[in-house]
Design a protein with these regions (language model features):
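Conserved helicase motor
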Residues: 56-62, 136-139
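Short active-site oxyanion
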Residues: 26-32, 105-108, 156-157
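Glycine-centered tight-turn and secondary-structure capping sites
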Residues: 92-94, 251
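Short glycine-rich anion-binding loops that position phosphate/pyrophosphate groups of nucleotides
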Residues: 12-13, 83-87, 163-165, 223-225
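Loop/turn-to-beta-strand initiation segments
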Residues: 3-5, 75-79, 155-156
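A contiguous loop/helix-start segment that scaffolds small-molecule binding in enzyme catalytic cores
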Residues: 2, 156, 163-274
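Class I SAM-dependent methyltransferase SAM-binding "motif I" and its flanking Rossmann-like core
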Residues: 95-153
Length: 274
């Protein structure tokens, strides 16, 4: 009988956030797939858990994923963890989930802390709709294309960033998006946790000197609805809604989605659909 892969969340800084269910899961499985076994060993030692581990990270995920799945198919249970937070989110564990799906292996989630959701919650920005953009590429062309594709994004945007890349990213956000609200969230759940609610302009001028230290989540205000892009017309908005309807969306849902894309009011688009 095949085993189970447990997708297990770990603390993002404060060990007190490790849930009893997560601890019980790591205690009960046959082995643990860890992004960095040295980091996970510290967590296990803190909670007195002794369990064999295998490394599973970006550069060995293809070969190691097959080995992990083979062991699960032979009846072993495995927990996958990342260094901090939920595995499989902006993380090579995503590929292991896909492999499990292909091979019919059952997966169970053991929820834990999430830097994305935690940062959004304290950002002071709109939380109803948001998009997680992960880390921006270090490649200048790819980075520019990524940011350029978000210029008309109305939803709140969330980025991860490393300390050594933060200065350039702050300058880029102001360059591509103009002056918008920005929350710089650093060292979540740790001793020096801080939420800096500012603007892209102020951040580019005052925080791009490399003085801020730690791990960062950047939460950026989306484009305001009234800022209609010149490239969109009402006709385009209505056509967009009609395509959504053809694909199975209800008229009200289609109008709402087309409004979020083009900046026109939902009711304005809906009237044209009737």
């Amino acid at each position: 009988m095949s085993g189970i892969l447990y997708v297990t969340g770990t603390p993002i800084g404060n060990l007190g956030d490790f849930s009893p269910r997560a601890a019980e899961t790591l205690e009960s499985v046959d082995f643990i797939a860890a992004e960095d076994t040295r980091v996970t060993l510290k967590l296990l030692n803190h909670f007195g858990i002794k369990k064999p581990m295998v490394s599973y990270f970006e550069h060995n995920k293809r070969e190691r994923g097959e080995i992990i799945c083979n062991r699960i198919e032979q009846g072993e249970n495995c927990a996958i963890v990342t260094d901090a937070g939920m595995p499989c989110i902006s993380d090579p564990g995503e590929d292991l989930i896909k492999l499990c799906e292909e091979r019919g292996i059952k997966t169970v989630v053991i929820p834990g802390p999430s830097a994305v959701i935690s940062a959004l919650a304290v950002s002071g920005l709109e939380t109803g709709r948001f998009t997680f953009e992960g880390f921006l590429s270090v490649n200048k062309k790819s980075r520019s294309e990524h940011l350029d594709s978000l210029k008309n994004e109305h939803r709140t945007m969330i980025f991860y960033e490393a300390p050594h890349k933060l200065p350039q990213t702050l300058r880029d956000l102001y360059s591509f998006f103009g002056d918008r609200k920005l929350s710089i969230v650093r060292e979540l759940t740790k001793v020096h946790e801080e939420v800096i609610r500012t603007t892209t302009k102020y951040a580019a001028e005052n925080y791009a000197d490399g003085s801020l230290k730690g791990e960062f989540v950047l939460v950026l205000e989306g484009k305001k609805q009234e800022e209609k892009s010149e490239e969109y017309t009402l006709e385009f908005a209505v056509q967009t809604a009609r395509k959504l309807i053809e694909n199975g969306a209800k008229p009200t849902e289609a109008a709402k989605e087309a409004a979020s894309i083009t900046g026109f009011k939902k009711n304005e688009i809906y009237r044209e659909l009737l």
